[in-house]
Amino acid sequence: YLYSARSVGLMHTLPIRREGLFLTNFLSGFAMTLIPYAVTGLLCVIVSLCGGAFDARGLAVTVLAVLGESFFYFSSATFVCFITGNAFAMPALYALLHFLAVLLDWLISSFAQGFIFGFSTYYTGVVEWLSPTVYLVNNVRCARQYVEVQQTFPDGTPYTSRLLTSADLESFWLIGVYALVGLALAALALILY
């Protein structure tokens, strides 16, 4: 409703403070993004229980990771909405803010490669932390440990298979950092509101 003057006038004549309107709309929008995750998570729990592979720790890590990343991206989208005030400019600015640092790094590095002797890289990754999507994809990963097990085929031929013994999420704390940044962006959006 913030993109139309008539809607803004109507909503702000209601006897609700601005903070109440912001919080209500923010939480309802965030809840709508979480509904598909809840359905998918419930189906995964049912399938893992039926298969005898349910892991409560893995489920908790997955839920926290999804909540943290979703909160960051939703908060940054809300902040960009309040900066632009235009429904058509919002997606462009959102994508630009999330990938501008990496694009500039690539552009400057590829430009410098033609002028600086010995500079032979197209991407340095120095400012990668300013691009949340690229940084999380490159730094948060699953560390798996396997054990080799000797088995035999029904005809008696031996073979070696790898059995997964543990899987841990490396650099999980980065998701928490970005969730805190999302909290700061939500607070800035509230101030702009």
Where are these regions (language model features)?
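Transmembrane alpha-helical segments in integral membrane proteins
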Residues: 1-5, 75-86, 175-193
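Transmembrane helix boundary and interhelical loop/hinge segments in multi-pass membrane proteins
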Residues: 1-14, 22, 26
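Juxtamembrane helix-boundary/capping and inter-helix hinge elements in multi-pass membrane proteins
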Residues: 13-20, 85-88
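Alpha-helix N-cap/helix-start motif at helix boundaries, enriched for small hydrophobics
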Residues: 20-22, 80
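Loop-to-transmembrane boundary segments
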Residues: 22-31, 170-171
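Secretory targeting signals
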Residues: 28-90, 94, 99-105, 109-110, ...
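Terminal transmembrane helical anchor/hairpin motif
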Residues: 99-192
